[in-house]
Swiss-Prot record:
It catalyses: D-mannitol 1-phosphate + NAD(+) = beta-D-fructose 6-phosphate + NADH + H(+). Belongs to the mannitol dehydrogenase family. Keywords: NAD, Oxidoreductase. This is Mannitol-1-phosphate 5-dehydrogenase. Pfam families: Mannitol_dh, Mannitol_dh_C. GO terms for cellular component: cytosol.
Length: 367
């Protein structure tokens, strides 16, 4: 089996490539980072190191890489030969990579599964729409399967450029009905993906976002520092109580199941062998304040149903306070707020109504 994976960064190598290689899949990475592409093409292997006490190490073999910066014969050949095409590039980049390989799908005669592995709800649909905008209708042998992915891969610098440190925990869930062919090991195939996507997004990503924005506000430089701050950790617990109410109300997870899941997630945040800078986790504020994203989506539901939502109000306010001159979205956010005010920003980007906007603005003003 052959896979073409777009995104040769830490998540691509340390999570998606790692799982595929463990299934004896021949992985070709596609990226625009020439340094990484050249290294992969030279070494054809790298180490994945678990952030546990033993630093358990697995060597990933039999990989190669190609540049995906534009049309090329090597990229075309990789698409035509692939049984699986995956991505880990960021949901905003999906339309860009679609341009690089979509035309080749018109020439493809063999079945392929296409799976976007992004921190976003139904990201494969986003990729599919971008592809079909370019190609028009494709044959029934092109299969698009949505997925939910979860593995913390921190910002890192290693002696070997290709080696990557990851947390021991991972979860990769794929739509069963949309998948073609034999199922792969270490991947969960489910009939209804939405509960898993939303549980992960509104527990892991919402919790991570709160720790990043609260950590930045209260002077804690890393996620580990933030979660070990009693005040911030108490706030995190309150945030996840609120998102848990949304999750158990909307989906078929019991309160006990969700409480156990929350405990597991907080334990992951506390892993002393795995820390991350709050500035890396906090970046992308314009996207993260969106109405269907990790903060406003559960907040709006709880607000509309007269359920407790104070902690999520504070999370939204902390995001608005967040400042990082190295993150372009945050720079744009702050420039917009300076010009149009917090209320104008929320109405334009969070799409909150007058009352909910007022609650967030009030919290913002007292921080």
């Amino acid at each position: 089996m052959k896979a073409l994976h777009f995104g040769a960064g830490n998540i691509g190598r340390g999570f998606i490539g790692y799982i595929l290689a463990d299934n004896d899949v021949k992985v070709t990475f596609a990226d625009v980072n020439e340094e990484i592409i050249n290294a992969l093409d030279k070494e054809h292997q790298y180490d994945v190191i678990l952030a546990d006490e033993a630093k358990t190490t697995t060597r990933v073999h039999n990989v190669d890489a190609i540049n995906s910066g534009g049309p090329s014969e090597s990229l075309k050949q990789a698409v035509l030969e692939a049984d699986l095409i995956t991505t880990a590039v960021g949901v905003n980049i999906l339309p860009i990579i679609a341009k690089s390989f979509a035309p080749y799908l018109k020439e493809k005669e063999t079945p392929v599964n296409i799976v976007a592995c992004e921190n976003a709800i139904m990201a494969t649909n986003t990729l599919k729409d971008a592809i079909l905008d370019i190609t028009g209708p494709l044959g029934d042998h092109i299969h698009f399967a949505n997925s939910a992915v979860d593995r913390i891969v921190p910002l890192q610098t290693n002696d070997n450029l290709l080696d990557v440190i990851v947390e021991p925990f991972y979860e990769w869930v794929i739509e069963k009905d949309a998948w073609f062919g034999p199922e792969l090991d270490h991947i969960k195939y489910v009939d209804n993906l939405t509960p898993y996507i939303e549980r992960k997004l509104l527990t892991v990503n919402t919790g991570h976002a709160y720790l990043a924005y609260a950590g930045r506000f209260y002077g804690q430089p890393t996620i580990l520092d933030a979660v070990n701050d009693d005040n911030i950790r108490h706030g995190l617990e309150n945030v996840l109580k609120e998102t848990s109410q949304y999750i158990t109300t909307q989906f078929n997870f019991t309160e006990s199941e969700q409480a156990q899941y929350v405990d597991k997630i907080i334990g992951r945040f506390k892993n002393p062998n795995l820390s991350d800078e709050v500035t890396r986790v906090g970046r992308g504020t314009m996207r993260k304040i969106g109405p269907q994203d990790r903060i406003i989506k559960p907040l709006s539901y709880l607000y509309q149903n007269n359920l407790k939502h104070d902690a999520l109000i504070k999370t939204a306010a902390l995001l608005l306070k967040y400042d990082d001159t190295n993150d372009q979205e945050t720079v744009e956010k702050n420039e917009y707020i300076d010009k149009h005010g917090v209320e104008g920003f929320l109405k334009s980007f969070a799409k909150t109504d007058d009352q909910l906007t007022s609650e967030i603005v009030k919290e913002y003003n007292v921080l």
